[in-house]
């Protein structure tokens, strides 16, 4: 009935609850089918054990019931997060408005990608909406709790949460969140096998991006599932994964320095426009510098919605260049019927044609990152068309 990606958090929670050696491949082959009724993950489990704490209550249910509840939670967080975000601008907003926007978000391509696989991406998107609202209302305890949860669940998508807290000078909150998340991972490894579990986990991670798998860094590989990171982009352009990784690392360092400097320059001018632009930059940068698949694009919906609401509402006036550069990403997130387009391209042009679609993902994210960087530069120079100042966070 559903895709099998929910197997990963469920089995991690089950193993943490019962003290099972989740990273032992033989144990996976023998026990995962018995517990879930599904086959074992073909390429192992790549989530750290601390993830199991974030979904621990679900392990008390059977796999089928937990899966249904998980899907309901994904939908609820998308709807509640969207509602909270829309109401940031008008507490008296008519119910029909936020309901219509939430409906469009649920129908968007990126949310469908996550829902199809029962991935956590829709949950992260909803949590990011709630996080931004908490920051807007100076509810830093709640914001820090959300950031801590995301760090425990999937630290690779936590940069927008951590970055916004740092931009607001909440260094202590970030330190506490990172410490708690780190302790959760240590406790998780201790619970599922200690040093042996850590060794098995690191061996599995080493093979995460194996050529010929869905996680391959080569977008021209027929087995490839679309990825978003610079390693994927550079490998597609150059053809050598190792060089692609090196170029990705260099690009990551340079962009990180530039973004850090820009955020520091804007630390006393964090109105909603600046915050939304920083959020877009952090979201794009976070998914470009680390391995991610296409469904993780849904987090970019948050900043794009914020900027779109302000632009369409006449609060800010985004330049044409910004709209052009973010247009491809917005179109893919909103409309792209990925499986259908992949099927058409494969039938017409073969794997090579499908490869062009794969490589379009990191290109579109990079263009949106460039757009956000240019907007940050305009904000830094205070050379931007804007209506009366927005309320500060």
Language-model-derived ranges and their functions:
Residues 308-393:
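Aromatic-enriched
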Residues 47-48, 56, 121, 154, ...:
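Hydrophobic alpha-helix-in-membranes signature
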Residues 1-143, 165-297, 301, 388-393:
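Primarily membrane-embedded glycan-assembly and transfer machineries that use lipid-linked glycans
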Residues 78, 149-166:
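Long, hydrophobic, well-ordered secondary-structure blocks that form the structural core
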Residues 152-155, 183-187, 330-335:
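Membrane-embedded alpha-helical segments of transport systems
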């Amino acid at each position: 009935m559903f895709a099998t990606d929910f197997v990963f958090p469920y089995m991690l929670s089950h193993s943490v609850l019962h003290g099972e050696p989740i990273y032992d491949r033989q144990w996976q082959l023998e026990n995962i089918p018995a517990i879930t009724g599904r086959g074992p993950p073909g390429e192992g489990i790549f989530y750290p054990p601390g993830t199991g704490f974030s979904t621990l209550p679900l392990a008390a249910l059977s796999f089928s019931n937990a899966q249904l509840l998980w899907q309901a939670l994904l939908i609820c967080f998308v709807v509640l997060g969207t509602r909270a975000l829309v109401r940031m601008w008008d507490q008296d907003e008519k119910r029909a408005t936020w309901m219509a926007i939430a409906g469009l978000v649920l129908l968007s391509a990126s949310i469908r990608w996550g829902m199809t696989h029962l991935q956590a991406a829709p949950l992260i998107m909803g949590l990011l909406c709630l996080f931004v609202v908490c920051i807007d209302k100076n509810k830093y305890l709640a914001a820090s709790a959300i950031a801590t949860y995301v760090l425990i669940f999937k630290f690779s998508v936590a940069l927008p949460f951590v970055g916004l807290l740092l931009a607001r000078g909440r260094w202590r909150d970030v330190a506490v969140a990172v410490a708690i998340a780190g302790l959760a991972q240590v406790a998780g490894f201790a619970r599922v096998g200690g040093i042996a579990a850590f060794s098995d986990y690191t061996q599995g991670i080493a093979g995460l991006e194996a050529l010929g798998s869905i996680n391959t860094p080569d977008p021209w590989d027929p087995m490839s599932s679309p990825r978003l990171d610079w390693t994927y982009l550079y490998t597609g352009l150059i053809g050598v994964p190792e060089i692609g990784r090196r170029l990705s690392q260099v690009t990551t360092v340079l962009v990180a320095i530039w973004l850090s400097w820009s955020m520091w320059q804007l630390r006393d001018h964090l109105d909603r426009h600046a915050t939304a632009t920083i959020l877009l930059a952090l979201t794009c940068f976070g998914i470009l510098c680390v391995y991610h698949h296409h469904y993780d694009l849904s987090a970019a919906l948050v900043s794009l919605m914020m900027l779109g609401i302000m632009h369409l509402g006449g609060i800010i006036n985004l330049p044409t260049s910004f709209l052009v550069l973010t247009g491809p990403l917005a179109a893919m997130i909103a409309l792209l019927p990925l499986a259908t387009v992949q099927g058409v391209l494969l039938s017409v042009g073969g794997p090579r044609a499908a490869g062009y679609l794969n490589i379009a993902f990191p290109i579109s994210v990079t263009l949106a990152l460039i757009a956000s960087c240019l907007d940050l530069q305009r904000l830094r120079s205070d050379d931007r068309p804007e209506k009366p100042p927005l309320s500060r966070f």
